[in-house]
Amino acid sequence: MSEPIQPTRPAASGCPMHGAQAESWHDAQMDFSKSMSYGDYLALDQILNAQHPRSPDHNEMLFIVQHQTTELWMKLMLHELRAARDCVRNDDLPPAFKMLARVSRIMDQLVQAWNVLATMTPPEYSAMRPHLGQSSGFQSYQYREIEFILGNKNAAMLQPHAHQPEHYAQVKAALETPSLYDEAIRYMARHGFAFDADCIERDWSRPVTYNASVEAAWLEVYRDPTHHWELYELAEKFVDLEDAFRQWRFRHVTTVERVIGFKRGTGGTEGVNYLRKMLDVVLFPELWKLRTDL
C-alpha cells in the first residue's frame, strides 16, 4: 500500500506579520536608498510635520488635521475648476464634464469630513479656542478663490489676504476673471444663443445675478436636450456641483452650531448667523429657476 499523502504545508505568505524574510515579500522592492520611495514622492515628512498645536489640549490635533486636509482637497478643486473653465473657454466641453464631476465628489468627501470634526464637544473646543487667536476658515484664500471662480464675487473679501501679497494677487485675479458660469454663457453666445450685451462683456468682479436672457437660452437647451446635448450635460454638471456645495455649506453650519452654538466666530463674524446667510447664495440662478418654468 502506498504511503498516505501528507498535506502540503502552505508556502510562507511573505507578510512580515508571519515572520517571512523582508526580501521575499512578493518580490517587492525593499531598498530605497537609491530610488524614490512612497514617502519621498508624497513629501510625507513635510506634510506630517506641518501640525503644530498651540495648546496642550489633545483635541487640537483633530482641528488642525481637519482643516489642513480640507485645504488639500480645495487645492484639487481649484486644479479641476480652472481646467474646466479653460475647456469651456476653448470650446471643448466634454473634458470639463469629468472635471466638474470630480469637484462634486470632492465636496461629497468634505461633507462627510464634518462628521469627524463633530466628534469634538463644546468643552473640548472651548479648551483650545483661546489659542486660535483671530485665525478662521473665513480667511482661507483657496476657499475664496473657489467662491470667485464659481461666480460668488465680492471685492471686500480681498482684504483678509492683503497681508500676503502672493495670495492677494491670486484671489484678486480670480475676482477679475470671468467665472466658470460666465465662460459658459460666452460659449453659448459664440454658438448662436442670444443674450443681453452685459452678459457677454461686463465688470467680471461683480457677482452673477439672474438675467432673463440667460434663462431663455438655457430653456432652449432643456427643451431640446438631444439637439444641445453637450450644453445640457454641462448645465446638469453645474447643478450637481451647486447641490454638493450647498450640502457642504449646510454641514458647516450644523457642525459649528453643534460645537460652539451662536458664539461669534474667531475671525469676528456672527458665526452661525453668518454661515446661514451664505446658504441663500445661488451660484447658477437661471438653472434653478428654469425647473419651475419648463
From Swiss-Prot:
<protein>
    <recommendedName>
        <fullName>Tryptophan 2,3-dioxygenase 1</fullName>
        <ecNumber>1.13.11.11</ecNumber>
    </recommendedName>
</protein>
<feature type="binding site">
    <location>
        <position position="125"/>
    </location>
    <ligand>
        <name>substrate</name>
    </ligand>
</feature>
<keyword id="KW-0223">Dioxygenase</keyword>
<dbReference type="GO" id="GO:0004833">
    <property type="term" value="F:tryptophan 2,3-dioxygenase activity"/>
</dbReference>
<feature type="binding site" description="axial binding residue">
    <location>
        <position position="252"/>
    </location>
    <ligand>
        <name>heme</name>
    </ligand>
</feature>
<keyword id="KW-0479">Metal-binding</keyword>
<dbReference type="GO" id="GO:0019441">
    <property type="term" value="P:L-tryptophan catabolic process to kynurenine"/>
</dbReference>
<keyword id="KW-0560">Oxidoreductase</keyword>
<keyword id="KW-0408">Iron</keyword>
<comment type="similarity">
    <text>Belongs to the tryptophan 2,3-dioxygenase family.</text>
</comment>
<feature type="binding site">
    <location>
        <begin position="63"/>
        <end position="67"/>
    </location>
    <ligand>
        <name>substrate</name>
    </ligand>
</feature>
<dbReference type="InterPro" id="IPR004981">
    <property type="entry name" value="Trp_2_3_dOase"/>
</dbReference>
<dbReference type="GO" id="GO:0020037">
    <property type="term" value="F:heme binding"/>
</dbReference>
<comment type="subunit">
    <text>Homotetramer.</text>
</comment>
<dbReference type="InterPro" id="IPR017485">
    <property type="entry name" value="Trp_2-3-dOase_bac"/>
</dbReference>
<feature type="binding site">
    <location>
        <position position="129"/>
    </location>
    <ligand>
        <name>substrate</name>
    </ligand>
</feature>
<keyword id="KW-0823">Tryptophan catabolism</keyword>
<dbReference type="GO" id="GO:0046872">
    <property type="term" value="F:metal ion binding"/>
</dbReference>
<dbReference type="InterPro" id="IPR037217">
    <property type="entry name" value="Trp/Indoleamine_2_3_dOase-like"/>
</dbReference>
<comment type="pathway">
    <text>Amino-acid degradation; L-tryptophan degradation via kynurenine pathway; L-kynurenine from L-tryptophan: step 1/2.</text>
</comment>
<keyword id="KW-0349">Heme</keyword>
<dbReference type="Pfam" id="PF03301">
    <property type="entry name" value="Trp_dioxygenase"/>
</dbReference>
<comment type="function">
    <text>Heme-dependent dioxygenase that catalyzes the oxidative cleavage of the L-tryptophan (L-Trp) pyrrole ring and converts L-tryptophan to N-formyl-L-kynurenine. Catalyzes the oxidative cleavage of the indole moiety.</text>
</comment>
<dbReference type="GO" id="GO:0019442">
    <property type="term" value="P:L-tryptophan catabolic process to acetyl-CoA"/>
</dbReference>
<feature type="binding site">
    <location>
        <position position="266"/>
    </location>
    <ligand>
        <name>substrate</name>
    </ligand>
</feature>
<feature type="region of interest" description="Disordered">
    <location>
        <begin position="1"/>
        <end position="20"/>
    </location>
</feature>
